[in-house]
Amino acid sequence: ERRLEARSWRLAVTTHPPGAQLSIRAAGGAARRARSPYKGTLRGGELELTVTRAGYERLVQRVTLDRHRALDLWLDPPGLLHHKLGELRSGSNPKQVAFSPDGRELWVSLLGGHGVEVFDTRTMRKRKAIRLGQHGAVEVLFTRDGRTVYASQMETASVWEIDRASFRVRRQLATKGNWSKVMALSPDERTLYVANWVSNDISEIDLRKGRVRRLLRTVRTPRGLWPTADGRRLYVAGFENGDLERIDLATGKSRTLLRTGGAMRHLVGDPEGRRLYADDMGTNQAFVVDLASERVRKLAATDNVPNTIDLTPDGRVLYVSNRGRNGSSYYLPGPEWGSVLAIDTASGKVLDAMVGGNQTTGLDVSADGRLLAFSDFLDNRIHLFAVPPYRELAAGGGGRAAAHRAELAKR
C-alpha cells in the first residue's frame, strides 16, 4: 500500500448515462465528490468509487490505482439483477456471439459483413477481423479445447475451419446442402452436423476426411441442432411448421415430437443430458423435453419473436433473446425493442429481464457462467453483462421481469 501511495496517477471516469454523482474514497481517507465525466490526479492505492444518479441503481466499484486508469461504467435501471459491463461496436448485422471456452474472447458472426470479428472480453477491444471470402457468417462454434473455430456460411453452403491462435483459415468444408446455418459437433468431435435451411437436410461431415458422409433428410427449414451425449440421436428444430424432430443416427429414421404450427428456432441441452430446451419464434414460447421419455411441455412464455437460447453451466437458468415484433421487413426496425429473459428452468418463472436494441438476436453465456453477451442485429452492437449467482436471481423478486414490459414499445 505504501508503495502504491508513493506516487500519483491519473484517473478518468465515464458513466452511461453521464452526469452521475461520484464519490471517490481512499482507504481511511475522506471522500472526494465530483460529477461524471471525471478526470483527475490521485494518490495511488485502493479506491472505492460510488456512482449514483436519479432513476438508476447505485454502483460501487473498487479500483486499485497502480497506473493511469480510465473507467467506463454503466448504471443499471432500477431492479435489474444483472450488471452491464459494456457495449461493443461490431460490423454489419451481428447474427451470433460466442465466448471462447476460456472466456477471454468473444467471436461475432457478421451476416451482413465478410466473416467474423474477435473481441477481447477484458479490454472490450476488437482483436481481429477474419474475412471469409465475399460473404458473411451465420454461426460460430468452438471445439471443447478452444483451439478450433467453425463458421457457417449460407451463400456458399460451406463451413470455414479457423485456427483460433493464429486466426487463420485452415480449410473450407462444402456441406453439399443449400443455405447452411446452424452447426453442432458430435460428442467425440469427429463429426460436424450442419443444418441446411433450403435443401431441408443435415450434412454429416467427417472432420478427419473433410467430406460429407451423408445427408439426413429433415422436416422443413431445419435450424437448431442438438446431438445427444451418447451420439445416438440428433434433435432438429424445424422453422417452417414449428417442428421438433428426433433423428436416429444409426438408421437415419426420424420422429416428430412436437408440431406447434409456429417457427421452432434454437435448441440447447442441459449439462446432465436429461433435458432439451427449445424456443418457438411463432408462438413466443420456450419448451422443455424430457430426453428419457421424449415428452415435451411448455416451460414459459417469452417476449415477442424469441431467437437464441443458452443455459448457465449448472443448467438452472435459461437465457432467451427476443427480437421484438417485426417491422415491415426483416431488415427494418420494428415497433418494439428487443430483450433478453432469464428463466428459471425448474419453475419456468422469469427471474430478470434486460431491454436490448433493434432485433436482439445472438446470445451466449460464458463457460464459467459469469458473463452474458447478446447482439442487436440492426444496431451492430453487442452488450456484455455480469451474471449474478443463481441464489441472487432466485431471491431477487423477479428483477425487471415485470417492469421491462413497459419499455419494449418504442415511443
Q: How would you describe each model-predicted region?
A:
Residues R10, D72-R411:
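Predominantly soluble domains enriched in secretory-pathway, periplasmic, or organellar proteins
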Residues E1-H83, A386:
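Short loop/turn and low-complexity linker motifs enriched in small/turn-promoting residues
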